[in-house]
């Protein structure tokens, strides 16, 4: 997908979003503007990639408030430089957090409350008024007697002489000094004194990050001997035990681990793996979110698309999302009070895989200058029919309910200009001033032909009215349907425009309401697609007057862009569809599209595309095609460059001359066009050959094949129906062996113009309830050389059959099965 955003750097420090929007919208139409003031950068979105390229080249290295800005096309989020910058930013952040956590752990390690010697010292110097006089002073020594000694202390003990030990012991007994405790503590790292086994287990649980508490156990304090008390006051083991007791004490110390080292080990391991665990957790959470979104999308096949431009419509979103699969519905949310888009939409796919693929490919991508954010949407609410309750209703009522519920999704098989037969005959009878009984004489054999003529007259009048009001009749040939206009059909004759307006206005704002003077069909256009959808669901198959209302979605691009909407019915005269001999010959003398006139257009902008070039010349009368001359781009293989000129083809020379006068000097993409007549060198013989070929083709288009012909129709009915539009050479209706019609026929006119008039007039007409399907029949070859080739081919096939017959035998021979076996026996 092409990028539609530009990156702006070097902005003034106090630049705002509104100022950035005003600066770029002075020359281009923008959809988004965002400024990061601390970094002095910003992003601007445009409707198309061409506009973004032009803005980048125009505003690059310009000045804004004495600041030189740099403008370039923004890089996608998934590009390689952006990924590297993101990775570097995450790495620096994790390093900072690791350093901070290390310092925090180091500070947390200085926990003075776990030092028993310091606690004992604080208890000694505490005021007597704050101490508990009834408490035992040697409570700190209850569990110290089981504390093991380290190997270093045992070796030092063996090296000391008994005299030093006795002397040291004598001094300690004589005068125990509290000040010696911190001095001895400098020889080794302070070890926390465990007051109870329960507290030891609790400290281990806290170090492992567990929350489960262990219930404390109460044990009675045992009396402490003098040797144990002295051992607790010294940092070195004194030789107060016998050799056997010392060996037993050493083995106990080796078996029992040091609990103080376990929290430190756990903290170091946690410090090493904290960042890796955090990154792994973040990545796993993102993967889980993506997997969850995909699961939800597979269930609903529906996407929620946000951060869209406020002027985006369903037609803009459809080419973007239809690449991944068939779309059932696109709904853009509108504010009912302000009649503006809310900036988000829902896309409903038919297949879940298509929705998942669109989610993966388009999430975070550019669309008209904005980054789309796609999320899974809940399934659309559907109103299902209760089959049990429906079965209790009459069969006719069941069909009506089902048909109304399926109206919005079903397609119709009849033609778009279908009209109620009764309404057509009522309209014609009123104009002629006669009753329908007189118009349709039951004793007449050609009542069906009269009805077909009346319908044809009304259809031609309706076409003339729609053309005068900006309706593109060629749009009825296409299958693509729009989402704002509705064709209203099959209502009774006598329904007025005001009646239809009152019927449709409660569903939304009507921008256009067209009803021909015949009053047999109407076109209603709404301002928003959701309003048209509501009206379609609410009014489909509703009874209006004496008939049921038929609604059909109008074709896409039904109205010309140059025609302003009209909500009133114009009073137009009924146009007669009869063709006189003078009209026929006048038409024959008119300009035929035999030679196509071409205009040469130069001084084009090199950025102008073929679509833009065609869009400018297409509204002109007689336009056929437009193209810009290009050449291969040597720097970009596979791409093309504009050569700055092009050609425009028209049907006739007069139309080309009128276009030259209108478009010469026209300004297109800041370039003034120079339009001249194209002088293509052509051989006189080649030009004469083209004219002869065109005349031959025009002469051949005189025979019409009539398909879907009713089986009750006769040759007389076909001649009566088609004879009103020209002189017929012959009429043929093929029949079966039982003399019944085969469902098609042929009508051969004298001139091609008469055949075309009959084709245009009767291609939407119904005969005995069947719509006639008309096509030009393929004539037999007129060129003598082609006739000779066909004869030679036929003779060759006959010769091949004769040769094959000679090889296989000319006749049947009689032979006896098993005769040879009897002879051998």
UniProtKB/Swiss-Prot annotation:
Tell me the GO BP annotations in alphabetical order: endonucleolytic cleavage in 5'-ETS of tricistronic rRNA transcript (SSU-rRNA, 5.8S rRNA, LSU-rRNA); endonucleolytic cleavage in ITS1 to separate SSU-rRNA from 5.8S rRNA and LSU-rRNA from tricistronic rRNA transcript (SSU-rRNA, 5.8S rRNA, LSU-rRNA); endonucleolytic cleavage to generate mature 5'-end of SSU-rRNA from (SSU-rRNA, 5.8S rRNA, LSU-rRNA); small-subunit processome assembly
The source's superkingdom equals Eukaryota
Protein location: Nucleus
The cysteines joined by S-S bonds are: none
One Pfam family it belongs to: RRM_1
UniProt-listed SMART domains = RRM, RRM_1
The answer on whether this UniProt entry bears the keyword Lipoprotein reads no
One GO cellular component term noted in the UniProt record for this chain = ribonucleoprotein complex
The record's listing under CDD domains reads: RRM2_MRD1, RRM3_MRD1, RRM5_MRD1
Keyword tags = Nucleus, Repeat, Ribonucleoprotein, RNA-binding, rRNA processing
Please name the InterPro entries in this protein's record.
Euk_RNA-bind_prot, Mrd1_RRM3, Nucleotide-bd_a/b_plait_sf, RBD_domain_sf, RRM_dom, RRM_dom_euk
User: What function does this protein fulfil?
Assistant: Involved in pre-rRNA processing.
Q: Which family does it belong to?
A: Belongs to the RRM MRD1 family.
Quote the protein name from its UniProt record: Multiple RNA-binding domain-containing protein 1
**Organism of provenance:** Aspergillus fumigatus (strain ATCC MYA-4609 / CBS 101355 / FGSC A1100 / Af293) (Neosartorya fumigata)
List the top taxonomic levels of the source.
Eukaryota, Fungi, Dikarya, Ascomycota, Pezizomycotina
User: What's the gene?
Assistant: mrd1
